[in-house]
């Protein structure tokens, strides 16, 4: 994504009610809509916000400003989770080997995303978060706990024995969870994540693990930013 003229490869996850468009090489840059055209347009709409995540890093993120710059290289059949509002199908790219170089790249991406998330959480301290039309919506710390809970579930999907400690101080739990994610990336680079769990269920690949952690954190980072009154 170093040049706006270069095409950005994206994949589409097509459910019955929702379609997700995701940038293959840019974990966390993934948005949904009810049809393919709008999903791609929404991905472009969020491109500047995604790029800002890396503004304080050495990651060169210059996103395109026109859906014509996208190359749709894969279409995946979605499922009920897709329609519920979360991407849930791994693109073929995520089955590629996960070596030490990819571990370093993935950790750099996640670290930048975590720091941006932390800045949003800090900006929301003492602020009211706008409620939904029916009065719903988690408060700031509830959003953080929700992200941590999802991370714990994702860790188990790559064979890590990890559970969220809801009684622990929030800051401590954030650090513990992120260290576990870093450890999982190391295990992935060493080839220690099996294809199946002990009971036979398929585990995620390390690349897809990174994609899901990034998407979910970015999604709630933007939720916090959008809901600050």
Question: Can you say where each PLM-predicted feature lies in the sequence?
Answer:
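Generic secondary-structure boundary/loop-capping signal
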Residues: 67-70, 126, 190
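Amphipathic alpha-helical packing segments from all-alpha helical-bundle domains
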Residues: 112-120, 174-183
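Short, contiguous alpha-helical
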Residues: 9-10, 15-36, 40-59, 107, ...
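Short, charged, surface-exposed hinge/linker loops at domain edges
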Residues: 2-6, 48-102
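Catalytic cores of extracellular degradative/oxidative enzymes
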Residues: 175-200, 204
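Short acidic-aromatic active-site loops that bind/stabilize oxyanions
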Residues: 103-110
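Short, flexible segments with low predicted structural confidence
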Residues: 10-12, 81, 88-89, 114-115, ...
């Amino acid at each position: 994504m170093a040049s706006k003229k270069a095409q950005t490869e994206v994949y589409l996850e097509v459910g019955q009610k929702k379609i997700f468009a995701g940038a293959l090489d840019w974990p966390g840059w993934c948005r949904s809509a009810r049809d393919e055209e709008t999903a791609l347009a929404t991905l472009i709409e969020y491109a500047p916000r995604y790029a800002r995540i890396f503004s304080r890093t050495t990651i060169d993120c210059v996103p395109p400003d026109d859906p014509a710059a996208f190359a749709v290289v894969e279409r995946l059949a979605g499922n009920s989770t897709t329609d519920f509002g979360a991407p849930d199908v791994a693109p073929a790219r995520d089955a590629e080997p996960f070596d030490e170089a990819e571990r370093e790249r993935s950790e750099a991406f996640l670290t930048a995303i975590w720091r941006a998330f932390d800045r949003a959480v800090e900006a929301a301290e003492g602020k009211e978060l706008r409620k939904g039309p029916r009065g719903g919506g988690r408060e700031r710390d509830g959003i953080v706990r929700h992200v941590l809970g999802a991370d714990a579930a994702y860790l188990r999907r790559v064979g890590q024995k990890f559970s969220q400690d809801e009684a622990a101080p929030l800051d401590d739990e954030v650090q513990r969870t992120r260290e576990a994610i870093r450890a999982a990336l190391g295990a992935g680079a060493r080839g220690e994540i099996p294809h199946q769990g002990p009971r036979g269920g398929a585990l995620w690949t390390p690349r897809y693990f990174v994609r899901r952690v990034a998407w979910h954190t970015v999604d709630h980072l933007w939720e916090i930013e959008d809901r600050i009154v």
